[in-house]
Design a protein with these regions (language model features):
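Active-site acidic/histidine proton-transfer and metal-coordination neighborhood
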Residues: 56, 60, 76-183
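A cross-domain feature marking catalytic cores of carbohydrate-active enzymes
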Residues: 1, 38-40, 63-68, 111-113, ...
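N-terminal pre-domain/capping segments
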Residues: 1-96, 102, 179
């Protein structure tokens, strides 16, 4: 994976800060690179303008990542948040991401629910969180069956325990969602 701009984890900041066009321009100089995974909403707020920039540099989009982890509102989860308003906003983010992906000419949206989990035992109601998350993903994916939603699992970070933290749980989760356009990023 190559990041074309600034990235930050909980320990440090890496790379040079670049706007979207600068990142696309740098990526276009990499031999063999013809497409990018772009991030909504941090990198792409206007898919038509983004498409013009990509075309200018001869680049495409392989996938659009919907970021439901990097803002304070997602602190207690997105699709599993105990707050129905936060869950509804996560669904809207996913729907917007699906629309943007279609405009950008790709048929895949990636998402990792990294703030959906816990730091301490018994911190949240797992059954409620799981069922709420299934309902949210089902609603978003049903909105655009022509675009695939690829869900990424991760054991931890930023949570000590992400609740969809391995391939088995994520495969079961996708089975419960029950839609052909929902799968697992391996």
């Amino acid at each position: 994976t190559g990041f074309m701009g600034k990235i930050q984890d909980r320990f440090a900041t890496y790379g040079v800060e670049r706007d979207f066009e600068q990142m696309v321009q740098v990526a276009s100089t990499v031999k063999g690179c013809s497409g990018l995974e772009v991030v909504y909403p941090q990198q792409v707020q206007d898919p038509v303008k983004a498409q013009e920039i990509l075309k200018k540099y001869g680049m495409g989009v392989a996938a659009l990542n919907v970021n439901v982890k990097g803002e304070p509102k997602w602190l207690y989860g997105s699709v599993s948040s105990p707050d129905a308003k936060v869950r509804a906003e996560a669904v809207e983010y996913m729907k917007t991401g699906l629309d943007y992906a279609a405009v950008l000419g790709c048929n895949k949206v990636t998402i990792a629910f990294l703030n959906d989990g816990s730091d301490y035992p018994f911190e949240f109601d797992f059954e409620r969180a799981f069922n709420d998350a299934v309902a949210c993903v089902r609603e978003a994916a049903a909105y655009r069956p022509d675009v695939r939603l690829s869900l990424e699992y991760k054991p931890s970070e930023p949570r000590v325990h992400c609740f969809l933290n391995n391939a088995g749980k994520m495969a079961y989760f996708c089975e419960k969602v029950g839609l052909d356009n929902v799968g697992v990023t391996l």
